Design a protein with these regions (language model features):
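C-terminal helix-rich "cap/oligomerization" subdomain common to oxidoreductases
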Residues: 1-16, 82-84, 312-362
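Contiguous beta-strand/loop segments that form the cofactor/metal-binding neighborhood of enzyme cores
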Residues: 2-6, 189-275, 305-322, 338-339, ...
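Active-site loop of classical SDR/Rossmann-like NAD(P)-dependent oxidoreductases
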Residues: 28, 50, 298-311
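Short active-site oxyanion
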Residues: 42-46, 81-83, 185
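Hydrophobic residues in well-ordered beta-strands that form the structural core
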Residues: 29, 68, 108-110, 135-137, ...
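Predominantly a Rossmann-like dinucleotide-binding segment in NAD(P)-dependent oxidoreductases
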Residues: 134, 141-220, 347
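Beta-loop-alpha module in the N-terminal Rossmann-like domain of NAD(P)-dependent dehydrogenases
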Residues: 62-127
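N-terminal Rossmann-like dinucleotide-binding module
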Residues: 2-62
């Protein structure tokens, strides 16, 4: 009988009562972050938004005691020890600069993507390094239960040497209004989940090859409404992402990893939010001789993974270590996103080292 304890849940620290100041009061903060924090017993103490009425509504729905009209006022509150940002990427650097300058702020959880450009992301990490502020990033797919389970199988060697991996998304994201002027939508705002998940599971690839096209169902200018990519690894592994954001029916996300000794496959439960269903994993090995293990759980990516992204930052503050998903972690992912854009614009395979070196990332 295979060991099916797959460590799908977050490993929370002993201290979870840091005062959290929330910047942003849209869907992701109101309906995902705050419910997850309350369920985990975390302590949101204040919230601010560009639209104060939204902040008041989110506070009432999620028992947040203080509401500020501006994020600057929130940062001045000495009860705020962790700043949780859910703002557009091109506005996060300014907030991080200000938050890191406050001596009572011990940590910052930035939304991904942390910035619109790789250069801004590098600057964000430098700012927090200079002040000693812990910078975590909300790469929440790393805490999707099926991804945690798959990572456990890979780390235990259950699947042998990975040969091919794939994430196939046929689901239509809701592109928020702030995204539309960017001109870059799928790779920067959706594929980044899958690119980062591949890095979490397998590390950095050597090269990326990308094909992308606009989504004909949208009337705003953009270059990448659909994105398809292959990550080429030094050991021969190929990780393939097919992000079809055009689809209008039968929304789903499937993934599969095949190794020399086993196969794992599963689904991501996100496309049917808000009704919601858990992600899944099925796996087998040569040793299991055709039997598939099919563990199941009640937790979902949205909102339960967000306990993990905040919890890993709290643990870093508690233990005075680098966050598991740190600013430096996201630099590798942002460099991969930059390489992906360069690949489809220039029609070539782009080495990841090319964009990392240009940005001065070790």
């Amino acid at each position: 009988m295979a060991d099916v304890d797959l460590n799908t849940g977050p490993d929370l620290p002993e201290k979870t009562d840091f005062g959290i100041g929330c910047i942003g009061a849209g869907f992701i903060m109101r309906d995902i972050h705050l419910p997850a924090y309350n369920e985990a017993g975390f302590r949101p103490v204040a919230i601010a938004s560009r639209t104060p009425a939204n902040a008041r509504t989110a506070a009432e729905e999620n028992r947040v005691p203080k509401v500020y009209d501006t994020w600057q006022e929130l940062l001045d509150d000495p009860d705020v020890e962790i700043v949780d940002i859910a703002y557009p990427p091109d506005q996060q650097l300014e907030i991080v600069r200000e938050a890191a300058s406050r001596p009572h702020v011990k940590g910052i959880l930035a939304q991904k993507p942390v910035a619109f450009t790789l250069e801004e992301a590098v600057e964000m990490v430098k700012v927090c390094d200079q002040t000693g502020t812990k910078l975590g990033v909300n790469h929440n797919m790393r805490y999707d239960q099926s991804m945690r389970a798959l990572k456990t199988l890979l780390d235990r060697g259950e699947l042998g040497t990975p040969v091919v991996a794939e994430i196939v998304m046929n689901a239509r994201p809701h592109w928020q209004e702030f995204i539309k002027p960017y001109g870059q939508i799928a790779l920067l705002n959706m594929s980044i989940h899958h690119l980062d998940a591949f890095r979490y599971l397998f590390g950095d690839p050597e090269r990326v090859v990308v094909s992308a096209r606009p989504d004909p169902s949208h009337d705003f200018p953009h270059e990448d409404g659909l994105a398809f990519y292959i990550l080429e690894y030094a050991d021969g592994l190929r990780a393939i992402g097919l992000d079809n954001c055009f689809t209008w029916v039968d929304h789903r996300i499937d993934w599969r990893v095949e190794g020399t000794e086993g196969v794992a496959k599963g689904t991501i439960g996100w496309p049917d939010y808000p009704e919601g269903s858990p992600s899944t994993i099925d796996w087998t090995t040569r040793e299991l001789d055709g039997k598939w293990e099919q563990p199941r759980w009640k937790e979902r990516w949205f909102p339960h993974a967000f306990k993990g992204t905040m919890g890993q930052l709290m643990r870093a503050i508690q233990d005075d270590v680098e966050p598991e998903i740190s600013g430096r972690t996201t630099l590798g992912t942002m460099a991969l996103v930059e390489a992906a854009y360069r690949s489809f614009r220039e029609g070539r395979a782009v080495p990841l080292e090319e964009t990392r070196a240009e940005a001065g990332i070790a």
